[in-house]
Curated annotation (Swiss-Prot):
<dbReference type="InterPro" id="IPR040919">
    <property type="entry name" value="Asparaginase_C"/>
</dbReference>
<dbReference type="GO" id="GO:0005576">
    <property type="term" value="C:extracellular region"/>
</dbReference>
<protein>
    <recommendedName>
        <fullName>Probable L-asparaginase 1</fullName>
        <ecNumber>3.5.1.1</ecNumber>
    </recommendedName>
</protein>
<dbReference type="InterPro" id="IPR036152">
    <property type="entry name" value="Asp/glu_Ase-like_sf"/>
</dbReference>
<dbReference type="GO" id="GO:0004067">
    <property type="term" value="F:asparaginase activity"/>
</dbReference>
<feature type="glycosylation site" description="N-linked (GlcNAc...) asparagine">
    <location>
        <position position="302"/>
    </location>
</feature>
<feature type="domain" description="Asparaginase/glutaminase">
    <location>
        <begin position="39"/>
        <end position="359"/>
    </location>
</feature>
<comment type="similarity">
    <text>Belongs to the asparaginase 1 family.</text>
</comment>
<dbReference type="Pfam" id="PF00710">
    <property type="entry name" value="Asparaginase"/>
</dbReference>
<feature type="signal peptide">
    <location>
        <begin position="1"/>
        <end position="16"/>
    </location>
</feature>
<feature type="glycosylation site" description="N-linked (GlcNAc...) asparagine">
    <location>
        <position position="106"/>
    </location>
</feature>
<keyword id="KW-0325">Glycoprotein</keyword>
<feature type="glycosylation site" description="N-linked (GlcNAc...) asparagine">
    <location>
        <position position="82"/>
    </location>
</feature>
<keyword id="KW-0134">Cell wall</keyword>
<keyword id="KW-0964">Secreted</keyword>
<feature type="glycosylation site" description="N-linked (GlcNAc...) asparagine">
    <location>
        <position position="246"/>
    </location>
</feature>
<keyword id="KW-0732">Signal</keyword>
Amino acid sequence: MWRSIISFLFFSVALCQPFLFQKRSSNISDFISFNASLPNVTIFAMGGTIAGYASSSTETVDYAAGSVGIATLVDAVPAIKNFSNIRGVQVTNVGSEELTPANVLNLTQLILAEVAKPDVHGIVVTHGTDSLEETAMFLDMTVNTTKPIVVVGAMRPSTAISADGPMNLLNAVVVAASNRSIGRGTMILLNDRIGSAFYTTKTNGNMLDTFKSYEAGFLGMILDQRPHFFYSPATPTGKVHFDVSNTTELPAVEILYGYQGLNPNLAKAAVDLGAKGLVLAGMGAASWTDPGNEVIDGLISNQSIPVVYSHRTMDGFSDYYYNGIPSYFQNPQKARYMLMLSINAGYSIQNITDIFSLEY
């Protein structure tokens, strides 16, 4: 009983620490360990299943996401210290469905400050998988650096038998610490596979191998704690950089879902509620109904609302549709952030169309 109480108190105190690594050196800021021969990697923790806690080791569904602090996660993987010096920053600790553009903007600005430090080799972000690809895409478009940025999550909570989080975290640090990872943009890493933030997406709500990059393919894989890349360093075709270093708020952009008999007035309602742009998750390769297109045309012509036509299918290509902006290869959730950043930069509808078309 007393052991349980002590464990609970330790766990509760750990969650309250804003910066969980406090071991310091006179020369090194706040790395948990320091070996001059190893690269420095900073881990920004956002929460999610990788930081999830359940009352049973067999429970993989009914658990509390974002319950374990970054110090506890790192302590579970002592081998990390063999590959890099680690500094941990607990940014937030929630399920990723609760994250907002404000949270992602804050994370981005923290990372911008970190990669500007000459002694920092790479960045790891621990994150819930539900919206992981959105944050990764945002970072890929806003952090202009050749330093490795790796976004990692897990499909089983930290308390589960055979939890995938510890190995995923170790692999993410290995990739962030490797010179082979330089110049590849933001990467997503789970289940031993390394993917581009631009083209990797979550495809299954439950399975460990949920993250896929169907058409573009993976960048590489982890073999025996070594990153093996299939190609020389490169970034996605048409990748655009947006400066958000002084941005305090992003414009609202809503996603509307296409289906038989959709209410065409939902688009107008979204704009009336404050949306500055829309992304349509259209049927097939971005099809939208005729009544719906009439409303969209009015919003574009009369109110200069930029509207991106994307696809609700798992993968594919959305070419030019009506008077809107085709998303080409981008799915709705990633196209939303690209549109938000474009509007924030003050680009016209034609400018935004050109930005989306660069990858084609």
